[in-house]
């Protein structure tokens, strides 16, 4: 198991719990820490964390971002890329992060505020593939942030908190500090229920994806060629929600995974039966062309390095470092 460790209470609680369970499951635990270089003391903190891990007999790999950007979405992409590479090199079958039920509730509220579709609102899953051989696991989704704090204190684990988690410039931090406390005051237990809703949406999404694949197969211009185009008239005869879901899924399969919900709505308007042929640029440089009979992609769009799931539609601008 490759554990992503920031030094905060969630990831330290994760290390403590999995270390205690190691004797039962005989896991090989490897720690990974990413230094974004955002703070003058980040290298010192990384060194202190490395010293603690060595004292505990836990191997830790340090990675420093060579071209840091003060954008959480870019940082998150860098972390996932490095974690995938490290997992493959070390032979780890799972990357494990310390996301909690509190993170899930915050993500749901963020996606609701953005007008995200259901896929985004159920984005933090227990388990999902990163590539053909490595899965991403989030075993702490059953715990709230206050509970991971109790675990950290009970196990007497050290902390290296990240001040950026309190920076009000990030949307997630303001939801954590300002929005959720109001919801908890109005409806005690709101965070836990929001997390449960996100979990149910994720479960429903997995079943829905199977149905979407069957429906898309019927809409292909060439049944044996998923890149041969989509039947425009058949697509636009469907109910609006089904049109939206199937077009989004098809575009993802063509490589355009970063199309926003607003862009999707504008595209559907252009595909109405009374509108003529046209074309539209896709994220990443590809182009979508349509005649009165079919839709066709040329050049592809973005080729995402991970399956759609956590942040591709749209990306979460501030998912804390795991």
Predicted segments with their positions:
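Core alpha/beta nucleotide-donor-binding catalytic domains of modification enzymes
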Residues: 1-181
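Residue-level recognition of alpha-helical structural elements
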Residues: 71, 190-193, 260
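Generic structural signal for individual residues within well-ordered alpha-helical segments
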Residues: 76, 84, 149, 195, ...
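Amphipathic alpha-helical interaction segments
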Residues: 104, 174, 178, 196, ...
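An accessory alpha-helical subdomain
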Residues: 183-208, 214, 231-246, 250-251
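Conserved Class I S-adenosyl-L-methionine
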Residues: 213-224
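Mid-to-C-terminal catalytic/tRNA-binding core of tRNA(Ile)-lysidine synthase
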Residues: 223-321
């Amino acid at each position: 198991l490759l554990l992503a460790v920031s030094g905060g209470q969630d990831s330290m609680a994760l290390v403590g719990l999995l270390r205690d369970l190691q004797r039962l499951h005989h896991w090989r635990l490897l720690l990974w820490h990413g230094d974004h270089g955002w703070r003058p003391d980040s290298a010192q903190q990384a060194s202190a964390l490395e010293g603690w891990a060595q004292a505990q007999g836990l191997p830790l790999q340090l990675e420093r971002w060579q071209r840091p950007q003060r954008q959480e979405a870019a940082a998150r992409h860098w972390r996932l890329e490095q974690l995938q590479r490290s997992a493959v090199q070390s032979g780890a079958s799972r990357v494990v992060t310390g996301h909690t039920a509190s993170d899930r509730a915050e993500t749901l509220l963020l996606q609701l505020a953005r007008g995200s579709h259901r896929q985004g609102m159920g984005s933090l899953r227990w388990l999902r593939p990163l590539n053909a051989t490595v899965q991403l696991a989030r075993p702490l989704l059953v715990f709230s942030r206050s509970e991971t704090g109790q675990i950290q204190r009970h196990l007497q684990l050290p902390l290296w908190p990240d001040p950026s988690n309190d920076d009000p410039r990030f949307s997630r931090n303001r939801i954590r500090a300002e929005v959720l406390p109001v919801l908890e005051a109005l409806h005690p237990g709101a965070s836990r229920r929001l997390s449960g809703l996100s979990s149910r949406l994720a479960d429903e999404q997995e079943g829905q994806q199977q149905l979407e694949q069957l429906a898309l197969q019927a809409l292909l211009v060439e049944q044996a060629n998923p890149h041969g185009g989509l039947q425009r008239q058949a697509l636009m005869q469907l109910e609006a929600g089904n049109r939206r879901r199937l077009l989004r899924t098809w575009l993802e399969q063509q490589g355009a995974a970063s199309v926003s919900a607003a862009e999707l709505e504008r595209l559907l308007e252009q595909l109405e039966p009374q509108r003529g042929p046209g074309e539209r640029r896709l994220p990443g440089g590809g182009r979508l062309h349509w005649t009165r009979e079919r839709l066709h992609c040329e050049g592809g769009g973005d080729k995402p390095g991970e399956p759609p799931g956590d942040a591709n539609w749209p990306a979460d601008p501030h998912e804390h470092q795991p």
